[in-house]
Amino acid sequence: FTDAEEDARRRDFTMNGLFEDPFSLPPGRVVDYVGGVEDIRARVLRCIGEPDRRFEEDSLRLMRAVRFAVTREVQVEKETCSSIFRNAPLLARISPERIREELDRILLSPGRKRGVEMLVETGLMKHVIPEIYDMIGCTQPPQWHPEGDVYTHTLMMLDALGRDGSPVSLELALGVLLHDIGKPPCRQVDETGRIRFSGHDKEGSSMARV
């Protein structure tokens, strides 16, 4: 058995390490051993104790950090963020099913664009959908895509989802994330310099099914 403080210090992030005193009068007194109240007020996501140890204990916390950042609209504290970069390879320990659950929650959030950016920038996406990295720098015909490469276009599309107030299903969000995933392997430039992506729709469909 452990006491409440020891239990709190084993949790992942400070905002998840709070307790309610069931005997307090008036009821509702918050017991905070880890500075969670202050971090919630400051809108900061911070690991409890040593971040590296927390992510070593349960590497799915790496994905949970991104999910909380986008669903709670908080900033990841510097040491926690650095630890995510260092420990991204640990995500390979986690089953695809558990990773998929966290990805789904990110994509269903209005902050899905930021979530995908964070997964890419931290290196976590290498263990989720590594083909996303091939979109970066994959240029497109500027007359049709002045926004830039395939990755930039995909982020813009993710950001546009739900802007008109319409509901965003998981199928729609995944479809937008993967709709151009077949472009990088199909990219060709002809003798006139024209960029083509012949067959990218079929290639992308095959890749998405995998």
Pin down the residues of each PLM region.
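Catalytic cores of the polymerase beta-like nucleotidyltransferase superfamily
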Residues: 1-210
